């Protein structure tokens, strides 16, 4: 298993301060000991309108020169929207990200079934407004209708992915998806060789050892991508502690080993961050956590992977 850094960590959304450019991200990933990067599919990092083929190939050349892989791109798509124009624009967005991923040499595109979005107020991101809008637009639709729209979006997107030689990695991420069983149900219903799984531990509701191993066995060879997250602190004995607990990750890594997974597990810092003295923490908080996250995961893989 290889360790990656997801660019949402340095997108400038959740901390005070500017984003890192993708060139800076590549250097940061190398400095911290990551094997590769995953590029978030929105500005200022990975909006496909900003990344024509020529520019993608230039970035890939820079990454290759640093020994850093560009292993994935991440879509922030919402295939659940009942608004025709919104739903159709999401198909175009994902299709263009598939093209961009292929031009970057990335093997996977992370996709959602649905996504509420984020807003800036004025700099720090928030989920609350986007969540209210999403919830309101779904008040007159049924769960079955939402599911069907998501399936239709993935069916069309999987065809585009096949054209470009890219694999869509469906994440077990809410809304619509409640747990890994929903993720697997959708993958089986779409029934495309170009749609696989992205099972992530942090967003599993049940993190018991039994459920972690059960989920891994059921996902099996469909697993092509994974993420980890959280905030880290160094204990007095020098060990690194994760805020959701280290033990679930031990079981997750063991479970991934048991199913023969050898792809990437990428770190992401993607949630509202602490407020200190009345201000949200700055980029140094993201840097500290990204550095410790790499050390944390490499240590787990050495011991249990």
Model-derived regions: residue spans:
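Short loop/turn segments at strand-loop or loop-helix junctions that form parts
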Residues: 8, 75-76, 112-116, 268-270
